[in-house]
Amino acid sequence: MASPTASSILQYSGTGQKEKGTLDHGDVPSVDIGKGETKEVFQENVDGVEFRTVSWQRATVVFLKINFAMSILAIPAALGALGSIGGSLCIIGYTSLNVYTGLILGDIKHNHTECHTLADMMGLIWGRWGRELVGVQIIIAQTLVTAGGVVAITIGFNALSDHGTCTVAFGLISAIAVTAFSAIRTFSKLGWLTWIGFITFVIGVFIFVVAVTQVDRPAAAPQTGDFDLGWAPIAYPSFVVGMVSVTNIFISTCGSSNFIPVISEMKRPQDYRKACLVAGFIVGAMYLSFSLVIYRYCGVWLSTPAFASAGPIVKKVAYGVSLPGLILGVGIYQHVAAKYAFVRVLRDSKHLQANTFTHWGTWLGINIALGTAAFIVAEAVPILNYLLGLAGAICLAPFSLIFPALLWMHEFKKYKTGTTTQKVKYSFHVLIMMFGFFMMIAGFYSVVVLIKEAFDTGTIAKVFDCADNSGFVQGK
């Protein structure tokens, strides 16, 4: 991972008190450290909802579930396009880079406790309009990822029931289940359920990974005669296919912008770095090991999502075990968007933490609206890889690469003309920003091209389609 220069954003005096930062606060309420006043979004010891109750261990589990989720169902197909070496380097590289930028965001949050989301942070640079623009981007990103989750859950329902009813009906049930979980108000309470979700999802994935090593050939491969597994250390995909595959790997660990609201609810926000590093290491190791095993035994004969590759029985078992984890994991993404909008509407009012009608009406109304939007998007583009790729390109590349680099450069603007070492550090973050722009533009173009091809070829036959979506095969 890159050099730990992000840690220098936050400096402590001998008493452990945080020194005042150098950022221009713009329209975001400032912090007067000298007077001991803070502008934390959620206050402690209030007559109402206590939000700041999350331990670093529980935060770690939330971070794990944010990042280790639907992507494990899409990454093996990405390795099929990139090869084992190319895919492995992408997983290691993106995990390291996303952890590093996550540490930058955490340090900015510690230096500016009034920031509840990435939108508030960008308001430090761009003012009110920048904050609102990034806020809209957060809603779009979380809606796209939630929609991808709804698609994954409908696949699970179809697999378990042998397509027992119209897929649109399963989509509606999925959106309702996700919204019910998302409507739990605090990350602390979500944390207990997240433990269950994370464990069940990992067990489901592990069952599938073991099962796929025991079959003679992948379910999608020809069932008689010789066939070419298609495994390769290095593959040579087209630019469009390669970019979508790279974007799907990138999105697997780029959830660090979702960590920021969790920091606002931690008992000890200074423990964030510990939680971020532990979660990043575990998630990267699981993605790398599980994906390599799946690709080794399936090659290019991968179903999308991957659970179908081991046959119908294993697919049912894996989905049956992991479905609670899928629902809970997707609910966290919607919860982050809902919490942003909720705080945006009620910030600095008595209704933010008081159990009033306005509090509950706003919270539930926002969750229902977001769940409805995710359902509509899921039925309009019902392929998981494309939804994740779209979210990664237009939203998560800025969130995890461009914006953290800009925040670092704004904090250390003097490095631009400083010593040679300082100039190198500044240039490194300029490169991160430029790479983020490349991911955003090239990724968006590639995903749009593939979505158009999917409609043209009938892979996506129509919107709000009742057809079974649990057996789509990607391969030769």
Swiss-Prot record:
Main localization of the protein? membrane
Induction entry: Expression is induced in response to 2-benzoxasolinone (BOA) exposure. Expression is also induced in response to 6-methoxy-2-benzoxazolinone (MBOA) and 2-aminophenol (2-AP) treatment.
A Gene Ontology molecular-function term? Answer: L-amino acid transmembrane transporter activity
Under what name is this protein listed? Answer: Transmembrane transporter FPSE_08127
Role noted for this protein:
Transmembrane transporter; part of the Fusarium detoxification of benzoxazolinone cluster involved in the degradation of benzoxazolinones produced by the host plant. Maize, wheat, and rye produce the 2 benzoxazinone phytoanticipins 2,4-dihy-droxy-7-methoxy-1,4-benzoxazin-3-one (DIMBOA) and 2,4-dihydroxy-1,4-benzoxazin-3-one (DIBOA) that, due to their inherent instability once released, spontaneously degrade to the more stable corresponding benzoxazolinones, 6-methoxy-2-benzoxazolinone (MBOA) and 2-benzoxazolinone (BOA), respectively.
What the entry lists under PANTHER family is as follows:
AMINO ACID TRANSPORTER, AMINO ACID TRANSPORTER (EUROFUNG)
Pfam families (UniProt xref): Aa_trans
Name a GO CC annotation attached to this entry: membrane
Q: What happens when the gene is disrupted?
A: Shows significantly reduced growth but does not affect tolerance to benzoxazolinone.
Q: How the protein sits in the membrane? A: Multi-pass membrane protein
